[in-house]
Amino acid sequence: MKKPVVIALAVAALAAVLAGGTWWYQSRQDNGLTLYGNVDIRTVNMSFRVGGRLASLAVDEGDAITSGQVLGVLDKAPYENALMQAKAGVSVAQAQYDLMLAGYRDEEIAQAAAAVKQAQAAFDYAQNFYQRQQGLWKSRTISANDLENARSSRDQAQAQLKSAQDKLSQYRTGNRQQDIAQAKASLEQAQAQLAQSELDLQDTTLIAPSDGTLLTRAVEPGSMLNAGSTVLTLSLTRPVWVRAYVDERNLSQAQPGREILLYTDGRPDKPYHGKIGFVSPTAEFTPKTVETPDLRTDLVYRLRIVVTDADDALRQGMPVTLTFSDEARHE
């Protein structure tokens, strides 16, 4: 009789343990917060900053892209020509600026001084001739027209003398500060144009801004492109973000840094891990894409969860179940 009693007691104890375990599991599930979200779709529309003819594309839709990878190239010839022209412009402006700083050579000053002497001699002759003509005019030996011609020759010689003297003075004192400043500004303008030409040539190569997967290839080689027109669309694969929404009643559980578990239909028994990286400071009406029926008419707060152990199986747009359990909090 003792053996059946022992068996009965063992069965009762096992049932109690199972009942207690079931109650504990259900209480843990009931205390945890479950939300529904989607892996965020993050894309970059890539384009050339300059326009031109598309020479080549090195990638196709579905290709894995790495940051810094060359994706496409425009025809460089027009921009290489512009760069050569800009370099020549800098050389001309630099030579003019150096000339302004250096002033005039001794040979130029000597030539200017000789020109002053020659102009002075011409003026002295014209002045003496005019004075003689004045004496003859008084005795009515010459006509008024002859006197006027002599005066005109004297005035012309005087003007030429002053011009030669001014030129000599300029040569001796050097260029004016205003002229030097103007030459410097012209040089800086040419240098800026050169820098822009170098940048334009550099921008004929399209570089991937980050890792990802190529979604679309909008054009083909040979196409004429405007600056800024979309050439390729890149899907950013890292980091992986999940977008979800929480109502005000449960907002206190969704604090930045909180660790959570993320389940997908393809991995119902092996969750991903993540942390809340952002909680929207303002409420909004629930978007139509939210799958929880009781939240669709509520004001909710948007969450961004950063997946810390993402792999290639976690695709953009994929629905995800988020569990805010005590295990996730302390894991």
UniProtKB/Swiss-Prot annotation:
The keyword DNA-binding does not apply. The keyword Signal applies. Its main location: periplasm. GO terms for cellular component: periplasmic space. InterPro entries: CusB_D23, UPF0194_membrane_YbhG, UPF0194_transport. Residues 142-207 form a coiled coil. Keywords: Coiled coil, Periplasm, Signal. It is found in: Periplasm. Belongs to the UPF0194 family. This is UPF0194 membrane protein CKO_02332.
